[in-house]
Amino acid sequence: SQPAIRACAEIMVKASTLEKDGFANLRFAALANVPAYAPFFPAAYSAESQPTFALALEAADLAIQAFSSAATLAAARTALISEIEANARKLEAVAEQLQNIYHYDFKGLDFTLAPFPKEELSIGTALQKLGLSAVGYQGTLAASAFITDTLDQAKFKRCGFNGLMLPVLEDYTLGQAAAQGTLAVSDLLLFSAVCGTGLDVIPLPGDTSAEEIYPVLLDLSALALRLNKPLTARLLPMPGKKAGDE
């Protein structure tokens, strides 16, 4: 609802002042169409009283490994599916053991390709391995769709997003693209139509108002509802920072 969206925008602005670096907003996300049991920290919730668990993977490195040695898109797809399914089998076996020991309900795996802040563990790097000259240029949407379509074809017990995470503050290559002006919030919103989690850890100027954040969240919600997919937003106004500051 619009009141809920506006409330989220106001919370993001207020939370930005709770810590000097503005990182309190790492622990708050606006959710749109997100189901229960998604193992994504700020969006996770349960719909029942019984203890449950799910596993989320920072699996950008699997994509980089799969794409680095692939000569064609078909080979890249096959390699990534193979990597995901091989790792899923190992994780599911361990999770099922834990389920039997502790009687917690195992909901599944979220293989959303999430990065770690190193170039060799960057989802932006994985996208460029598919032939992009730079993330944010034309072709990024198609490359993003290729990855999420590949994830859809892998076979494992699913929960959560199982898509593509593009967190600017947590990804070396995406951060470089944003700093160089080739990757903007409008681009990330466009990619959300084919990706996974939406707008994640996007730094904003410290003086960004709730009135400026509100329409961004409104657009994200419209995408989530129109496309019937889960999306989230973690937007971080950075105290004392302006556009272009480091």
Predicted regions span which residues?
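Anaerobic metallocofactor- and corrinoid-dependent redox/one-carbon enzyme cores
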Residues: 1-246
